[in-house]
Amino acid sequence: MTDAGKKERVSILCVGSPSITTLLGWRLQQSSVVTCQETIMFFNAPEPSTNVFTIQSKKFGTRKYRPTYRLSKLEEVTSDSEPFDYVFVSIKPNSRNFQLSNILEPVITAKHTCIVYNSTGAIGVEEALQRQYPENPIFSLITHTPVSQRSVDEFFFGDCAPFYLAPAGSNLEIDQLSRLVEILEGGEISSEILDTLLPLEIEDLALPLSLYPLTVLTQNPNLPKLLERPDINDLHQGILQELDSLCNCLGSSLDVKKLSKQRETLLSHMQVNPAFREYRSNRPVEIVQYLHYCIDLATKQSLQVPRLRTISALISSIQHLPLVQPHHMNDMHGPTDNSPKKNKVLVNMRPINPSSFVSDRHSPLHPYSVPENGKPNMGRIPSAPSLSKGRAMTADNMDMLSLTTRRSRRSLYSPSLMQMQQSLKSDYEGLGRTFDPRFAPRGSPPVRGGKNVLSPEAKEHTHKNISPESSRFGTPSDPNSSSQSLGNEVLSRPNSNSNSAESRNGETDDSGESETYFTLMNNNKGVEPRASVASETSSMTVIPNAMRRFPLARGTSRMKS
């Protein structure tokens, strides 16, 4: 408290993952010791559309949190703005994409800003910050509070675990560290100061250091199945013993109960571990730098760690090689195995076997060579499957299918299509008798050029018992009628315009189109067009009955095909 009775004002920046950043900003704002002007920034995360966050916790219940300030990027901090007193950093380093020390440069004020790095799940990151900012105090922070983000603006916190803080390296700024602990405890966060956090960091990384590199070296991301091998399990236990010896040199030891609980959680985690995922995506494996740091610590303590050195050398030599499909990807069990398989062809394809790139000693052919008998088939369209062969349009069913629409053609099932093919498969000489015996077969030749008339037998049939159903489909009721007579001039062909019938009177005999038309309708390539006029009449009389047998349009009474 100041002399005027007012609280001290402290400017704090929290940058990192949304969950831990929101937790820190929320509790610092509620501190009863100082007036905290906190600024939060979500690093490498989607920008929320609102400035109010919903926070649920077991200790404090459901609360609304509105940060004092927000930044979308660190470059928004101007040089004339008030410097930050504390900067909480919860960012994992990524040497391939960015340097952590360079990112923090706009918000760090030399000899003033205190850097607090959240080293939960990491080790040795503070050394790079010490080299970049030698004049600023740097502290390490570890917390095991379970945090989760349910949506962009909704967070959940479990039991509030204590915060462990310690000076990084040779920093002895105990006064600023004690002041920071008071601010955190004013926000009801229990905090504790330790001499070093290295034993806790090694304990958190013991299982990842002893398991993740083995999944990369064996090309098997399935941890439970990997530990079933006796040699791999012995190697895993040997690495844990070396890490325990390193903790003993630092004045601590690994907690066996905590390790067993972590092992159960890790082995039940069905997703691929981050080290194997980074290796598969051709990115630097993060666990390698942690291995190097543990080896350096062992060297300073004059401790022999042969297994750690061997694993570190092997994984460092293969992480920059070209990627090879793993041998045991099918052994990995994960949530993706239970997801629906959209493309069965692609799902069933096995990954490329590395041995397929080497010529097979049992086969004289190259793996990618094509035999001579298969070269003529290269580039051809594969034949239709057995189910689609029955639906293909052939010369037998082209006459009827050419009169149908695409929708009705799609609704023709194979039994109906087979029935149609059987009806139309006979010679076109008896086509009229197949559907309706009332009409005569092909009759007399035309009387006049370009004019079609019916034989007396056909006229007699047309006068007898014309059903209203046939007249509904356009069957003429009067052969002498001027508008619908089969023997008159206005007799129109299927799918043609009847208004242009007179214009075709003199062109029917000589045009190539009519010859092609007669050939298609009558399947009678040897018959002249003039001699096939009666066949056209016979075909015309078949169309209404065919349509009656296979209805094409929707109606009140629709026959089920």
UniProtKB/Swiss-Prot annotation:
Q: What is the scientific name of the source organism?
A: Schizosaccharomyces pombe (strain 972 / ATCC 24843)
Q: Which domain of life is it from?
A: Eukaryota
Q: Where is this region: Disordered?
A: 369-390, 429-515
Listed under GO cellular component are: cell division site; cell tip; cytoplasm
Instruction: Report the residues modified as Phosphoserine.
Output: 383
Composition-biased stretches, type Polar residues, lie in: 465-503
Keywords tagged on the record: Phosphoprotein
Q: What is this protein called?
A: Uncharacterized protein C24B11.07c
Q: Name one Pfam family in it.
A: ApbA
